[in-house]
Amino acid sequence: MADGKIKSGAQLAPNKTLDAALEAIVNSAAQPLSSLSVLAVKAGKTVYHKQFGAKWIDVTNPANNKPADAATMYRIASISKLVTTLGVMKLVETGKLNLDEDVSKYLGYTLRNPHFADTPITLRQMLSHTSSLRDDGGYYWEASLKLGLRDVLLPGGVGYGKGAMWARNAKPGVYFQYANLPWGVIGSVMESVTGERFDRLMRRLVLDPMALPGGFHPADLSDADLANVATLYRKRTEVNGKEVWNSSGPWIPQVDDHSKQRPAPRALPDYKISTNGTLFGPQGNCRLSAAGLAEIMLMLMNDGVHRGKVILKPATVAEMLREQWRHNGKGEKVAGGSNGDPNGEADFGSARRLMNAWGLGNQHFLDITGAGNGDRLVRAGGYRAYGHLGDAWGLKSAMVFNPFSRDGMIYLIGGHGVDPETTPGEYSGMYRHEEKILDALYTLAVNPAQ
């Protein structure tokens, strides 16, 4: 079972060596970070939990900066997909959803890739990024646009355009391409079968039963919880549509700066349930702390049990973590026999070979290594894991764990002072500072050999 409430750094044995290593990473001239929250689990117990930097920065008077702490929540970006999957699997358990059913049944209209009109699209495909949906036509439509997903996804719809959201070269179920759009469809499906708005449904199914503050809709957070949400930063502006980084310049807020006013609601009062599942960001809009992610990690390690309460059945967790796709090593071209693109172009750059195997809403890290490419998590190798990465608005994040050794690591980076593309990894497709964070956590806190 989990070791009770996640402990803050002050409640754990001191680890000054790791403190110093992470402090040096955060304050590095090569890649300064606005804030960092980390957590390490060893043999099923939290052994390290620490924060560095500021969750909110006053560029005119640093004395007013608000330091990140154990309660600080971040917009966790694509780790949200793993959280959303927990909600899907709860609905599968109750019989409201079937992973292999044609999702048209749930949506109320026929959803097909028009280039492969005879092939149904399923939740299993969408959760494993093999649905043939692509991000090229967009993946979020704000409420003011008054568009439903059917207006975007169906030929002839007012938002369909040139149909860039559909793959032309691979039918559903056969080719992996990391994408965000399927998660908007998943959100609509979840709303359709429950009659509940996605963000509130996720609170009922997952966050409230686990007593986790945060959620997918900041406008609904209490003032106290909202004050715990970190602002994400970059030292970057745009000039004529091009990024301009200035490492000696000020930290520029990117998202979640609520210092002057509360966030606006994402849905209009007349929102019709299930019409636009992208509104609340099932793919990336969840706010959680490192401690909150650790509760989820430990629940999955414990076969679905969280502090004595069954969140998911053991068989459900096993199915969620079971491998659904693995790259066949034949590059990324369908014509060359490839079964997927391991480069993760939608969110994670290109030519980085970062994605090599997938479960349902979770990545499988196979310890593949190369200079600036691969999914290796620690320099010495040998650590395979499940989990997810995140990358958006200056944040980079990771939640990775091995349920067999019961070890895991979490980091949430609140902002970058230098373009991460200038600091590629030495032995993986992650950036160099991400490698350093994970390697420090592993060697100085997690290493099972210690």
Predicted feature locations:
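Short, well-structured active-site flanking segments
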Residues: 47, 63, 69-71, 83, ...
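Short, well-ordered beta-strand elements
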Residues: 396-402, 406-423
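Short, surface-exposed coil-to-beta transition loops
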Residues: 281, 393-397
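Active-site SXXK
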Residues: 19-25, 38, 44, 75-100, ...
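Short, conserved catalytic-motif segment at the N-terminal edge
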Residues: 12-74, 165-166
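A short, polar/charged loop-to-alpha-helix boundary motif
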Residues: 56-68, 420-433
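Short, surface-exposed loop or secondary-structure junction motifs
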Residues: 56, 114-379
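Short, hydrophobic/aromatic-rich segments at coil-to-beta transitions
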Residues: 379-387
